[in-house]
Amino acid sequence: MIRILPLEQIKENGLTKNFYLRSIENDSHRELSEIIGSDYTVFESGKAAIRALIEDLKLTRNDEVLITTTTDTSFVSTCVSATIFNYCKISRILTENTKAIFIIHNFGFPHTGLKQLRLIADERMIPLIEDCAFGFDSYNDEGIRLGSIGDFSIYSLPKIFPIEYGGILSGKNHLKSRNSDEYLAKQIKEWVPKLWHIKKMRTSNYLLLFREFSRESIYKEAVEENPFVFGLCTYAYKEIEKMHNDVEFSRTHVINEIHIPVNAFAESMEYESLIVCLMQFAHSHANIKDK
Protein backbone atom coordinates (compact mmCIF):
# COMPACT_ATOMS: atom_id res chain seq x y z
CA MET A 1 0.00 0.00 0.00
CA ILE A 2 1.40 3.37 -1.00
CA ARG A 3 0.96 6.08 1.62
CA ILE A 4 0.98 9.77 0.86
CA LEU A 5 2.79 11.99 3.32
CA PRO A 6 0.63 14.09 5.63
CA LEU A 7 0.35 17.73 4.68
CA GLU A 8 2.38 18.93 7.66
CA GLN A 9 5.35 16.82 6.61
CA ILE A 10 5.07 18.03 3.03
CA LYS A 11 5.10 21.62 4.26
CA GLU A 12 8.17 20.92 6.40
CA ASN A 13 9.96 19.54 3.36
CA GLY A 14 9.03 22.64 1.38
CA LEU A 15 7.70 20.29 -1.28
CA THR A 16 4.65 21.98 -2.69
CA LYS A 17 1.33 23.59 -1.94
CA ASN A 18 -1.95 21.78 -2.13
CA PHE A 19 -5.49 22.85 -1.50
CA TYR A 20 -8.54 21.27 0.03
CA LEU A 21 -11.46 23.02 -1.60
CA ARG A 22 -14.07 23.07 1.14
CA SER A 23 -16.37 25.36 -0.79
CA ILE A 24 -16.95 22.83 -3.55
CA GLU A 25 -18.21 20.09 -1.24
CA ASN A 26 -21.37 20.08 -3.35
CA ASP A 27 -22.69 18.70 -6.61
CA SER A 28 -19.69 20.04 -8.55
CA HIS A 29 -17.27 18.26 -6.25
CA ARG A 30 -19.21 15.01 -6.48
CA GLU A 31 -19.53 15.25 -10.25
CA LEU A 32 -15.82 15.87 -10.70
CA SER A 33 -15.02 13.00 -8.33
CA GLU A 34 -17.31 10.68 -10.27
CA ILE A 35 -15.57 11.54 -13.56
CA ILE A 36 -12.08 11.12 -12.11
CA GLY A 37 -13.15 7.96 -10.35
CA SER A 38 -11.98 8.58 -6.79
CA ASP A 39 -11.32 11.26 -4.23
CA TYR A 40 -8.80 13.81 -5.35
CA THR A 41 -6.46 16.54 -4.16
CA VAL A 42 -6.04 19.87 -5.92
CA PHE A 43 -2.52 21.31 -6.31
CA GLU A 44 -1.15 24.52 -7.76
CA SER A 45 -0.22 22.62 -10.95
CA GLY A 46 -0.02 19.18 -12.49
CA LYS A 47 3.75 19.30 -12.04
CA ALA A 48 3.29 19.98 -8.32
CA ALA A 49 1.03 16.95 -8.12
CA ILE A 50 3.75 14.82 -9.74
CA ARG A 51 6.31 16.14 -7.26
CA ALA A 52 4.10 15.29 -4.29
CA LEU A 53 3.52 11.75 -5.51
CA ILE A 54 7.14 11.00 -6.46
CA GLU A 55 8.29 12.41 -3.13
CA ASP A 56 5.94 10.06 -1.32
CA LEU A 57 7.19 7.00 -3.17
CA LYS A 58 10.56 7.53 -1.46
CA LEU A 59 12.58 6.50 -4.49
CA THR A 60 16.37 6.60 -4.31
CA ARG A 61 18.82 7.90 -6.90
CA ASN A 62 19.41 4.36 -8.19
CA ASP A 63 15.70 3.67 -8.65
CA GLU A 64 14.08 4.13 -12.04
CA VAL A 65 10.68 5.28 -13.23
CA LEU A 66 9.67 3.79 -16.57
CA ILE A 67 8.08 6.46 -18.77
CA THR A 68 5.99 5.20 -21.66
CA THR A 69 3.86 7.24 -24.05
CA THR A 70 1.09 6.74 -26.59
CA THR A 71 3.31 7.73 -29.51
CA ASP A 72 6.43 5.95 -28.18
CA THR A 73 8.69 8.66 -29.61
CA SER A 74 11.84 9.97 -27.96
CA PHE A 75 10.07 13.14 -26.87
CA VAL A 76 8.84 13.34 -23.26
CA SER A 77 7.61 16.58 -21.76
CA THR A 78 10.15 18.11 -19.38
CA CYS A 79 7.26 18.79 -17.00
CA VAL A 80 7.37 15.04 -16.41
CA SER A 81 10.96 13.99 -17.07
CA ALA A 82 12.72 16.86 -15.27
CA THR A 83 10.38 16.67 -12.30
CA ILE A 84 10.93 12.94 -11.81
CA PHE A 85 14.66 13.23 -12.50
CA ASN A 86 15.01 15.47 -9.44
CA TYR A 87 14.33 12.38 -7.33
CA CYS A 88 15.50 9.33 -9.28
CA LYS A 89 16.40 8.04 -12.73
CA ILE A 90 14.06 7.86 -15.68
CA SER A 91 14.05 5.11 -18.27
CA ARG A 92 12.17 4.20 -21.44
CA ILE A 93 12.62 0.46 -20.87
CA LEU A 94 11.67 -1.91 -18.08
CA THR A 95 14.63 -2.97 -15.91
CA GLU A 96 15.24 -4.64 -12.57
CA ASN A 97 15.53 -1.16 -11.07
CA THR A 98 12.09 -0.02 -12.24
CA LYS A 99 10.15 1.07 -9.16
CA ALA A 100 7.19 2.78 -10.84
CA ILE A 101 5.56 2.95 -14.27
CA PHE A 102 4.48 6.35 -15.59
CA ILE A 103 2.08 6.31 -18.56
CA ILE A 104 1.62 9.47 -20.62
CA HIS A 105 -1.55 9.56 -22.70
CA ASN A 106 -0.23 11.89 -25.39
CA PHE A 107 -2.69 14.72 -26.08
CA GLY A 108 -5.60 12.66 -24.73
CA PHE A 109 -5.05 9.65 -26.99
CA PRO A 110 -5.03 6.42 -24.95
CA HIS A 111 -1.89 4.36 -24.48
CA THR A 112 -2.57 0.98 -26.08
CA GLY A 113 -0.69 -1.03 -23.45
CA LEU A 114 -2.79 -0.19 -20.39
CA LYS A 115 -3.80 -3.73 -19.47
CA GLN A 116 -0.33 -5.17 -20.05
CA LEU A 117 1.31 -2.45 -17.96
CA ARG A 118 -1.26 -3.03 -15.21
CA LEU A 119 -0.28 -6.69 -15.11
CA ILE A 120 3.43 -5.83 -15.00
CA ALA A 121 2.89 -3.35 -12.19
CA ASP A 122 0.87 -5.89 -10.20
CA GLU A 123 3.45 -8.62 -10.75
CA ARG A 124 6.26 -6.37 -9.56
CA MET A 125 4.13 -4.75 -6.84
CA ILE A 126 5.00 -1.25 -8.06
CA PRO A 127 2.65 1.69 -8.65
CA LEU A 128 1.15 2.46 -12.04
CA ILE A 129 0.72 6.21 -12.66
CA GLU A 130 -1.35 7.68 -15.48
CA ASP A 131 -0.64 11.17 -16.79
CA CYS A 132 -4.03 12.35 -18.00
CA ALA A 133 -3.09 16.03 -18.28
CA PHE A 134 -4.48 16.09 -21.82
CA GLY A 135 -6.84 13.16 -21.41
CA PHE A 136 -9.56 14.22 -19.03
CA ASP A 137 -12.71 12.14 -19.56
CA SER A 138 -11.19 10.20 -22.45
CA TYR A 139 -11.84 6.50 -23.04
CA ASN A 140 -10.01 3.86 -25.03
CA ASP A 141 -11.54 1.50 -27.59
CA GLU A 142 -12.53 -0.93 -24.83
CA GLY A 143 -14.49 1.73 -22.98
CA ILE A 144 -11.89 2.09 -20.22
CA ARG A 145 -11.64 5.60 -18.85
CA LEU A 146 -8.13 7.02 -18.80
CA GLY A 147 -6.99 7.34 -15.21
CA SER A 148 -9.04 4.39 -13.96
CA ILE A 149 -6.42 1.66 -14.48
CA GLY A 150 -3.52 3.28 -12.64
CA ASP A 151 -3.02 3.49 -8.90
CA PHE A 152 -2.71 7.24 -9.35
CA SER A 153 -3.65 9.71 -12.05
CA ILE A 154 -2.49 13.26 -12.76
CA TYR A 155 -4.61 16.01 -14.32
CA SER A 156 -3.91 19.60 -15.36
CA LEU A 157 -6.82 21.96 -14.75
CA PRO A 158 -5.84 24.61 -17.37
CA LYS A 159 -5.99 21.85 -20.00
CA ILE A 160 -9.54 21.04 -18.89
CA PHE A 161 -11.01 24.43 -18.06
CA PRO A 162 -10.14 27.98 -19.19
CA ILE A 163 -8.44 28.80 -15.89
CA GLU A 164 -4.96 30.00 -14.96
CA TYR A 165 -3.54 27.21 -12.82
CA GLY A 166 -4.28 24.03 -10.90
CA GLY A 167 -3.54 20.32 -10.98
CA ILE A 168 -5.18 17.20 -9.59
CA LEU A 169 -3.75 14.06 -8.01
CA SER A 170 -6.26 11.25 -7.85
CA GLY A 171 -5.65 7.83 -6.36
CA LYS A 172 -6.05 5.33 -3.60
CA ASN A 173 -4.91 7.88 -1.06
CA HIS A 174 -5.18 11.63 -1.16
CA LEU A 175 -4.05 14.71 0.71
CA LYS A 176 -6.31 17.18 2.40
CA SER A 177 -5.24 20.58 3.56
CA ARG A 178 -6.64 23.06 6.02
CA ASN A 179 -5.87 25.70 3.40
CA SER A 180 -8.27 26.61 0.65
CA ASP A 181 -7.93 28.35 -2.67
CA GLU A 182 -11.05 30.35 -3.38
CA TYR A 183 -10.12 31.04 -7.00
CA LEU A 184 -9.87 27.34 -7.84
CA ALA A 185 -12.96 26.54 -5.81
CA LYS A 186 -14.97 29.14 -7.69
CA GLN A 187 -13.64 28.11 -11.10
CA ILE A 188 -14.22 24.40 -10.57
CA LYS A 189 -17.72 25.08 -9.31
CA GLU A 190 -18.42 27.18 -12.40
CA TRP A 191 -16.93 24.91 -15.05
CA VAL A 192 -17.67 21.36 -13.90
CA PRO A 193 -21.33 21.58 -15.02
CA LYS A 194 -20.04 22.56 -18.48
CA LEU A 195 -17.69 19.59 -18.89
CA TRP A 196 -19.99 17.76 -21.28
CA HIS A 197 -20.24 20.83 -23.53
CA ILE A 198 -16.46 21.38 -23.42
CA LYS A 199 -15.82 17.79 -24.48
CA LYS A 200 -18.46 17.96 -27.20
CA MET A 201 -17.05 21.15 -28.74
CA ARG A 202 -13.44 19.96 -28.58
CA THR A 203 -14.34 16.69 -30.29
CA SER A 204 -16.41 18.54 -32.88
CA ASN A 205 -13.49 20.80 -33.82
CA TYR A 206 -11.15 17.81 -33.97
CA LEU A 207 -13.50 15.97 -36.32
CA LEU A 208 -13.71 19.02 -38.60
CA LEU A 209 -9.99 18.66 -39.18
CA PHE A 210 -10.02 14.87 -39.28
CA ARG A 211 -12.71 14.67 -41.97
CA GLU A 212 -10.61 16.78 -44.32
CA PHE A 213 -7.21 15.32 -43.49
CA SER A 214 -7.86 11.76 -42.35
CA ARG A 215 -5.13 10.42 -44.66
CA GLU A 216 -2.56 12.81 -43.20
CA SER A 217 -3.74 12.50 -39.60
CA ILE A 218 -1.22 11.14 -37.10
CA TYR A 219 -4.01 9.96 -34.80
CA LYS A 220 -7.20 8.09 -35.48
CA GLU A 221 -10.73 9.42 -35.56
CA ALA A 222 -11.90 10.49 -32.12
CA VAL A 223 -14.78 8.35 -30.87
CA GLU A 224 -14.50 8.15 -27.10
CA GLU A 225 -11.31 10.21 -26.83
CA ASN A 226 -11.25 13.86 -25.81
CA PRO A 227 -8.34 14.97 -28.04
CA PHE A 228 -6.32 18.07 -27.23
CA VAL A 229 -4.61 18.40 -30.62
CA PHE A 230 -4.97 17.36 -34.22
CA GLY A 231 -1.75 15.88 -35.57
CA LEU A 232 -0.90 16.43 -39.23
CA CYS A 233 1.90 14.69 -41.08
CA THR A 234 3.42 16.97 -43.71
CA TYR A 235 6.75 17.82 -45.26
CA ALA A 236 5.73 21.46 -45.59
CA TYR A 237 5.53 22.25 -41.91
CA LYS A 238 7.54 25.49 -42.11
CA GLU A 239 5.26 27.04 -44.71
CA ILE A 240 2.08 25.83 -43.01
CA GLU A 241 3.12 27.27 -39.66
CA LYS A 242 3.39 30.72 -41.22
CA MET A 243 0.12 30.83 -43.09
CA HIS A 244 -2.49 31.13 -40.34
CA ASN A 245 -1.86 33.58 -37.51
CA ASP A 246 -4.89 32.57 -35.42
CA VAL A 247 -3.73 29.05 -34.60
CA GLU A 248 -0.69 28.12 -32.58
CA PHE A 249 1.29 25.22 -34.03
CA SER A 250 3.89 23.06 -32.34
CA ARG A 251 6.57 20.64 -33.51
CA THR A 252 8.01 18.75 -30.58
CA HIS A 253 7.83 15.13 -31.68
CA VAL A 254 8.89 14.50 -35.27
CA ILE A 255 10.22 17.05 -37.73
CA ASN A 256 7.56 16.40 -40.38
CA GLU A 257 4.62 16.56 -37.95
CA ILE A 258 2.68 19.54 -36.69
CA HIS A 259 0.13 19.60 -33.88
CA ILE A 260 -2.82 21.96 -34.06
CA PRO A 261 -4.43 22.66 -30.66
CA VAL A 262 -8.12 21.76 -30.54
CA ASN A 263 -9.77 24.52 -28.55
CA ALA A 264 -13.24 23.83 -27.19
CA PHE A 265 -13.90 27.56 -27.03
CA ALA A 266 -12.84 28.40 -30.58
CA GLU A 267 -15.57 28.90 -33.14
CA SER A 268 -15.81 26.19 -35.78
CA MET A 269 -15.40 28.90 -38.41
CA GLU A 270 -11.81 29.41 -37.23
CA TYR A 271 -11.01 25.78 -38.01
CA GLU A 272 -12.97 25.94 -41.25
CA SER A 273 -10.82 28.91 -42.26
CA LEU A 274 -7.70 26.94 -41.35
CA ILE A 275 -8.91 23.97 -43.39
CA VAL A 276 -9.37 26.20 -46.45
CA CYS A 277 -5.82 27.49 -46.04
CA LEU A 278 -4.41 23.99 -45.65
CA MET A 279 -6.33 22.67 -48.64
CA GLN A 280 -5.23 25.56 -50.85
CA PHE A 281 -1.66 25.04 -49.80
CA ALA A 282 -1.86 21.30 -50.43
CA HIS A 283 -3.30 21.75 -53.90
CA SER A 284 -0.81 24.41 -54.92
CA HIS A 285 2.29 22.68 -53.59
CA ALA A 286 1.20 19.02 -53.82
CA ASN A 287 3.48 18.08 -50.98
CA ILE A 288 1.20 17.04 -48.16
CA LYS A 289 2.62 13.65 -47.31
CA ASP A 290 0.67 10.73 -48.77
CA LYS A 291 0.39 7.83 -46.36
Residue ranges of model-derived segments:
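Conserved PLP-binding active-site segment in aminotransferase class I/II-type PLP enzymes
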Residues: 1-45, 52, 56-60, 96, ...
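Conserved glycine-rich beta-strand-loop-beta hairpin in the small C-terminal domain of fold type I
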Residues: 5, 9-19, 189-192, 199, ...
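PLP-dependent aminotransferase-like
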Residues: 27-34, 39, 44-123, 127-137
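Short, solvent-exposed loop/turn segments at secondary-structure junctions
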Residues: 47-49, 71-73, 106-109, 134-136, ...
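Generic structural signal for small/hydrophobic residues in well-ordered secondary structure
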Residues: 49, 65, 105, 131, ...
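Glycine-centered flexible beta-alpha turn that most often forms the glycine-rich phosphate-binding loop
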Residues: 131, 240-244
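Active-site PLP attachment segment
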Residues: 148-179
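Conserved PLP-binding active-site segment of the aspartate aminotransferase-like
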Residues: 231-235, 250-277
